[in-house]
C-alpha cells in the first residue's frame, strides 16, 4: 500500500467549492458531516479504484452511490458512450437507443411492460406518486421511516440518505398540507401497515425493498409478501423504489429476489452505468395513464438522453447472470471477512449483503428498522471510516448508507481490502479521540 500524501490540493479545491456551493457540495452527504473531516476531491477512477486530486489511490466501495456495477470507467461503457457522442449529445426526439434500453429492462423485469425514462430517481418517484394518486383517486401515500425516495416534497418526511445523516427528520419548505398526505411507519412493522391501510385510503405503499438509505436493512420474512396482500385488499398500489436495488440484489431485481410483483417500479443508478438516467414503469394498463396517451402529465428535456441510453445498454449487456453471480460471490467474501475481523477483535458487528449491495452496523443483533440502525456505535464508525480512508479504502461517509461492489472487485482486491480494514479497525479501537 502506497503511503497517503496530504490532501493539500483537495483542501484548496474544497475551499473554493464552499464559495460556490452550499457546504461546498452538490449533494449533502458528500460534505462529510456524518463523519467529520474534509472530503477528498476525486480525480479519476478505473476498475475497483478511485484516485483523488492529490494522487492518493483507494479501493472504492461507494461506486458513485451504486451505479458503477461494472466498476469505474469500464471499457465497454466508454466505447458505447464515445460512439454515441459522435452522433450527437442530445436530440429531444425519439431514438432507437431508448427502445433498446427499455427492451433490456423488460427482459429482466417482465412486469415492466412500459417504462418512461427520466433524468433522476427523484423525477421517477415524483411521477409515480402523481400517477398513483391519479389512478386510485386517493391522496395519501405510505412510506417507511428511513427510506429515501428522492427529494420530492412528498417524500421528505422521516427520510433516509443525507436527510438521516444530517439528523433532519423532515425538511423546511415542505407545505404542511402536503406533508400530511405522507404517512410513515417503521420498516418491517406489518401490523402498523395493516392498521394504517384499514384506516386511511392509500394511493400507494412505497418502499425500498432493501433499505439502503438508512444503512442496509433487509425485510423480515413475509414482510414484502404481506405488503402485497394489504395493497390488494385495500386498493393501494404497491411501489418498489429500486433505484438502488435494481439489478444489484438479483439479476431481475427485487421482484425476482422476493418473488413479489409490484404495481409500479422506480429504477435508476445501474441502468445508466454512471450517467444521469432513471425510469419508472409498470403494466401497460397503468402506464397508459401517462401523457400523451393519458391525462397524467410528465415530461423532461433530457429524458432518454442518447449518451445515458448508450451507457445503460452497455452496462446491462455486460451484466450477464454469470457476472452478477460472481459479483455476489465476491461481496459475500468481503462481508464474511469483515465479520471475521470484528469477531477476532471482539467488536459487535451486524454485517449483511444481498447480491452486490452490502452494509454493516457496529452493534449486536440484526437491524430491522431505522430505529435499530440508530442504536449502532456511530462514533466507532466515524473512527473506522477515517482509519480505512488513510489506508486506501473509500467507504460511504455516513453510518447510514449502504455500500456496493462491482465486477472489478476480484479476489485480490477483496483480500487486500480486508487486510487494510483489519488494520483500520484496530486503529479505530485505540483512537478514542476520533475525528
Curated annotation (Swiss-Prot):
One of its GO terms (molecular function) is transaminase activity. Its EC number is 5.4.3.8. GO terms for biological process: protoporphyrinogen IX biosynthetic process. It is found in: Cytoplasm. InterPro entries: 4pyrrol_synth_GluAld_NH2Trfase, Aminotrans_3, Aminotrans_3_PPA_site, PyrdxlP-dep_Trfase, PyrdxlP-dep_Trfase_major, PyrdxlP-dep_Trfase_small. It comes from the Bacteria. Its main location: cytoplasm. Pathway: Porphyrin-containing compound metabolism; protoporphyrin-IX biosynthesis; 5-aminolevulinate from L-glutamyl-tRNA(Glu): step 2/2. Keywords: Cytoplasm, Isomerase, Porphyrin biosynthesis, Pyridoxal phosphate. Its cofactor is pyridoxal 5'-phosphate. GO terms for cellular component: cytoplasm. The modification N6-(pyridoxal phosphate)lysine is found at residue 269. It catalyses: (S)-4-amino-5-oxopentanoate = 5-aminolevulinate. Belongs to the class-III pyridoxal-phosphate-dependent aminotransferase family. HemL subfamily. NCBIfam families: hemL, PRK00062.1. Homodimer. This is Glutamate-1-semialdehyde 2,1-aminomutase. The lineage of its organism: Bacteria, Pseudomonadati, Gemmatimonadota, Gemmatimonadia, Gemmatimonadales. The gene is hemL.
